[in-house]
């Protein structure tokens, strides 16, 4: 089985491309989505699926992403869905929308694919319900502190004025201990003024700006 091909693109057509590998020109059928990203003379790597069916010439189908290949191969297991129709589904919907439609039982989404009518769309959703699922969202670490979006802006402003990053961070923490509502507001200008005021009045805890005399 040919799982992938890597080589120089020799030709890009409306429905296929030719990739030169070790002196051989390999014809790869692909969706417009994949073909649009290929350039003649450039090196590419395509995930491939080799399809050989009775009474039909074997064909090699290529995909820019492994997820596209997975959608294609799984759809071939649905009764009445051939490689051309499966390829069209990958092109029209894309992997994420195809998974989302199946998870939601949205058979109408598949009727937008050429060659798939209402009956076939319902069959696709039913047969793939337990085969194509949406990926689990990333799990956030428990008790992981969230850095406010304004923090980096205030630190950059303070270091630009000559304060060290260490003193800038300490100044923010100490200033907000006395005025915690500023952190909730997220007002960069007000937070910066408060930190500068704290840095200017604190004694023995911070250094003067390194870039100023």
Curated annotation (Swiss-Prot):
One BP annotation, GO: DNA recombination
CDD domains in the record: UBA_RuvA_C
Region (Flexible linker): 144-152
Region (Domain I): 1-64
Position of the signal peptide: none
Principal subcellular localisation of the protein: cytoplasm
GO cellular component terms given for this protein: cytoplasm; Holliday junction helicase complex; Holliday junction resolvase complex
Region: Domain II, residue numbers: 65-143
Molecular functions per Gene Ontology: ATP binding; four-way junction DNA binding; four-way junction helicase activity
Protein function: The RuvA-RuvB-RuvC complex processes Holliday junction (HJ) DNA during genetic recombination and DNA repair, while the RuvA-RuvB complex plays an important role in the rescue of blocked DNA replication forks via replication fork reversal (RFR). RuvA specifically binds to HJ cruciform DNA, conferring on it an open structure. The RuvB hexamer acts as an ATP-dependent pump, pulling dsDNA into and through the RuvAB complex. HJ branch migration allows RuvC to scan DNA until it finds its consensus sequence, where it cleaves and resolves the cruciform DNA.
NCBIfam families per record: ruvA
Domain statement: Has three domains with a flexible linker between the domains II and III and assumes an 'L' shape. Domain III is highly mobile and contacts RuvB.
Subunit and partners: Homotetramer. Forms an RuvA(8)-RuvB(12)-Holliday junction (HJ) complex. HJ DNA is sandwiched between 2 RuvA tetramers; dsDNA enters through RuvA and exits via RuvB. An RuvB hexamer assembles on each DNA strand where it exits the tetramer. Each RuvB hexamer is contacted by two RuvA subunits (via domain III) on 2 adjacent RuvB subunits; this complex drives branch migration. In the full resolvosome a probable DNA-RuvA(4)-RuvB(12)-RuvC(2) complex forms which resolves the HJ.
Family: Belongs to the RuvA family.
Protein name, per record: Holliday junction branch migration complex subunit RuvA
Native species: Kocuria rhizophila (strain ATCC 9341 / DSM 348 / NBRC 103217 / DC2201)
């Amino acid at each position: 089985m040919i799982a992938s091909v890597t080589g120089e693109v020799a030709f890009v057509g409306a429905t296929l491309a030719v990739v030169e590998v070790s002196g051989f020109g390999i014809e790869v059928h692909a969706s417009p989505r994949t073909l649009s990203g290929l350039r003649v003379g450039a090196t590419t790597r395509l995930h491939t699926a080799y399809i050989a069916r009775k009474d039909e010439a074997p064909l090699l189908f290529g995909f820019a992403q492994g997820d596209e290949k997975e959608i294609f191969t799984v759809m071939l297991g649905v009764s009445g869905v051939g490689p051309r129709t499966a390829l069209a589904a990958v092109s029209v919907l894309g992997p994420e929308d195809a998974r989302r439609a199946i998870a939601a039982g949205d058979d109408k989404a598949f009727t937008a694919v050429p060659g798939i009518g209402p009956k076939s769309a319902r069959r696709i959703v039913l047969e793939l319900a337990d085969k194509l699922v949406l990926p689990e969202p990333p799990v956030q670490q428990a008790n992981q502190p969230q850095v406010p979006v304004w923090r980096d802006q205030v630190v950059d402003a303070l270091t630009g004025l000559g304060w060290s990053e260490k003193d800038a961070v300490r100044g923010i923490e100490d200033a907000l201990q006395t005025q915690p509502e500023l952190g909730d507001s997220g007002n960069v200008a007000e937070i910066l003024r408060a930190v500068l005021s704290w840095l200017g009045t604190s004694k023995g805890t911070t250094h003067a700006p390194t870039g100023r005399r």
